[in-house]
Amino acid sequence: MNAEKSPVNHNVDHEEIAKFEAVASRWWDLEGEFKPLHRINPLRLGYIAERAGGLFGKKVLDVGCGGGILAESMAREGATVTGLDMGFEPLQVAKLHALESGIQVDYVQETVEEHAAKHAGQYDVVTCMEMLEHVPDPQSVVRACAQLVKPGGDVFFSTLNRNGKSWLMAVVGAEHILRMVPKGTHDVKKFIKPAELLGWVDQTSLKERHITGLHYNPITNTFKLGPGVDVNYMLHTQNK
């Protein structure tokens, strides 16, 4: 395990990095700011593992890994996992938690574009969860993910749709009313319509395989996957 610093790349929003650096120490607090990520992680992991035909023995890259919630869970499934993030503090938290948990994950501080320049075609599975809406050029991230995966490999994206409902649910509801995440976490202007994401995918070697919505029920306080991509959604693609 290591957390290495690397040169600054153009596709970095330093204000976004600073937001997550400020709360990095609470990444593994199950009742803290990242509680929603802990709550949805079993759904994300299950979707990825099922669609990829299992993770055991596979080489996996988690782009925008943060404090390592998904990366660790994929390593527990028997994958060899590398986690990428540009936040130094979240990576330190991820590294320490993996050490305490006895989980082997290789954490690297560099952009996905930098990683793709050195490791093209080396991964069986690439995941990019809740990251695209936090960078200046999300299409560049999609291109890099396509470059990193092996032929026949799987790439997974998740993000937020851009519309009135997603603003009400993710910003007004989650940030201001329910206070599920810190205020300022989301910028609706950076949300991505499924048609936009699919358009970027179509310009790479990736092919869409499946898309699903991630839904929150405030009455039952539960999450589930299902039809409807009007707020949160996940996309499974495969390298041709």
UniProtKB/Swiss-Prot annotation:
Recorded GO MF terms: 2-polyprenyl-6-hydroxyphenol methylase activity; 3-demethylubiquinol 3-O-methyltransferase activity; polyprenyldihydroxybenzoate methyltransferase activity
InterPro entries: SAM-dependent_MTases_sf (IPR029063), UbiG_MeTrfase (IPR010233)
Keywords linked to the UniProt accession: Methyltransferase, S-adenosyl-L-methionine, Transferase, Ubiquinone biosynthesis
Gene3D superfamilies: Vaccinia Virus protein VP39
Any Pfam family the entry gives: Methyltransf_23
Classification via SUPFAM superfamilies: S-adenosyl-L-methionine-dependent methyltransferases
Disulfide bond residue pairs: none
Record-listed E.C. numbers: 2.1.1.222, 2.1.1.64
Residues given in the record as S-adenosyl-L-methionine binding sites: R44, G64, D85, M129
Range of residues in the leader sequence: none
Enzyme class (EC, first level): transferase
Catalytic reactions on record: a 3-demethylubiquinol + S-adenosyl-L-methionine = a ubiquinol + S-adenosyl-L-homocysteine + H(+); a 3-(all-trans-polyprenyl)benzene-1,2-diol + S-adenosyl-L-methionine = a 2-methoxy-6-(all-trans-polyprenyl)phenol + S-adenosyl-L-homocysteine + H(+)
Pathway: Cofactor biosynthesis; ubiquinone biosynthesis
Biological process per Gene Ontology, one example term: methylation
Function: O-methyltransferase that catalyzes the 2 O-methylation steps in the ubiquinone biosynthetic pathway.
Family the UniProt entry places it in: Belongs to the methyltransferase superfamily. UbiG/COQ3 family.
HAMAP family reported in the protein's UniProt record: UbiG
Protein name, per record: Ubiquinone biosynthesis O-methyltransferase
Gene: ubiG
